[in-house]
Swiss-Prot record:
Source species of the chain: Legionella pneumophila (strain Corby)
Function: This protein binds specifically to 23S rRNA; its binding is stimulated by other ribosomal proteins, e.g. L4, L17, and L20. It is important during the early stages of 50S assembly. It makes multiple contacts with different domains of the 23S rRNA in the assembled 50S subunit and ribosome.
InterPro entries found in the cross-reference section: Ribosomal_uL22, Ribosomal_uL22_bac/chlpt-type, Ribosomal_uL22_bac/org-type, Ribosomal_uL22_CS, Ribosomal_uL22_sf
Subunit (UniProt): Part of the 50S ribosomal subunit.
UniProt cross-references to PROSITE patterns, sorted A to Z: RIBOSOMAL_L22
One Pfam family, short name: Ribosomal_L22
Chloroplast among keywords: no
Transmembrane segments: none
Protein name in UniProt: Large ribosomal subunit protein uL22
Keywords on record: Ribonucleoprotein, Ribosomal protein, RNA-binding, rRNA-binding
Presence of the UniProt keyword Translocase in the record: no
GO annotation, cellular component aspect: cytosolic large ribosomal subunit
Single Gene Ontology BP annotation: translation
Length: 111
């Protein structure tokens, strides 16, 4: 059985999110939780909360045993970019792109 949790519009660039996603892909759930707790990145905190949500979904909706769960797919895709303007000298302006991403985590109890 495969259980999914999604976070849409996370305030994180997809490139930085993929660095964290690569660390926990194909790990068992308890190991992935430990890695995320001690990783000093903004994306780790977001993925920790999302992984805990996926574990709760598997436990409550499907009655899965937490010890058997593994992190299957971790997908970080680009979402909309918020465009902001920063004033510069002589009436000019620079564009600031605040990037967001969609994060999807699938946990499963199958090998």
């Amino acid at each position: 059985m495969e259980v999914t949790a999604k976070l849409k519009g996370a305030p994180l660039s997809a490139q930085k999110g993929r660095l964290v996603a690569d660390m926990i892909r194909n790990m068992n759930v308890s190991g992935a939780l430990d890695v995320l707790k001690f990783t000093p990145k903004k994306g780790a905190k977001l993925m920790l909360k999302l992984l805990e949500s996926a574990i709760a979904n598997a436990e409550n909706n499907n009655g899965a045993d937490i010890d058997d769960l593994k992190v299957g797919m971790v997908c970080v895709d680009e979402a909309t970019t918020l465009k902001r303007i920063s004033p510069r000298a002589k009436g000019r302006a620079n564009r600031i792109c605040k990037r967001t991403c969609h994060i999807t985590i699938k946990v499963s109890d199958e090998e």
